[in-house]
Amino acid sequence: MIKQLKYLLIISIPLFTSSCNGQINKETDKQSTEKLVTEKIEPYKYGAGDVVNRGYLDKSGNMWFTTLKEGVFKYDGKMFKNFTVKDGLCSNIVNAVVEDKNGIMWFGTAKGLCSYDGESFINIPLPQEDIQSVSSETGLPSRKTETVLSLIQASNGEFWVGTDASGAYRYDGKTFTSFLKFKGRLQPDDNVYNNCILSIIEDEKGNIWIGSFTHGGLSEIVGDNITHHALKDGYGDGMIATSYMDNKGNLWFGTRNGGIYQYDGNTFKNIADTNTGGQIAMASVLEDRKGTIWVASFARKGVYRYENKSFIPLDIKGSEKLNDIKFITEDKQGNIWFGGRYGLLWRYDGDKLKDFTQLKRIK
């Protein structure tokens, strides 16, 4: 992972936490990041749990990278600055990041929401008092959770928060309103609903689309009305991993095993070709400033360009290392960043790849 000090001259869909993959991530003690110390560098083999899972460009041109063990990193184009629980961050397990209309950074963590105004962090835990409520149809409860996996701020200023087990919440700055708590799979061991939300997006009309990774399908929220889309036509399995809106207003939805669906406002179309067979795990979608569609996969060759109705693997020096990619994002210079498991963080300038994966640093 990106394991290092407060400032560095060098240094990535999330690896699903808690109920999404049946594993519980626990906080681990971290060394203080307050002071620079003399150190040597040696190679370090990162494990699968060392994940750089989100990349985000803020309004000032800074890049933010969230991780599953090392908190958050801010990159100003020259140096990386690391924020952990030692600095007030609510948790070192961070799955989502967004900048609000006022320039405040918001993080989705294993301890709920966490806001940062440039000076201090504020924790906004998810509501726990409604967890005991049960479905009016089945009489069964939903899974309790504190973990945020996805986060956006809608055009009306409200936040939409996806959790790892309890569906989604709408947050207006004061009150959380629960959605889709009783969708998704029932855990066979205890008959409790488990709805893991990895993706939330707002379309051009202001409608909210919420994707479930635990077989809850795709939900479209228009005002107070909810429409469910199964996305099962022989390709998909109802596990929505990512969502994206391109410059034409088309929506893209990536699934765990069913490739990508494109929605033009009227029809869902499953996009498949002979290169992928339609059965590839999609983790992230991006349209760059040139109009090129990029797709990341958590399996096989990790990065593709979508050109002429075909997925073309990125094939340059170093690209064979781009496997199990969790996100793709673009910086203010037009460089494309990729990140994922085993601490991977790479930047592509249109010509070559540069590895920003951090080596282990020892005092």
Name each model feature, range by range.
Residues 2-363:
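Carboxylate-rich, polar loop motifs that coordinate divalent cations or form catalytic acidic clusters
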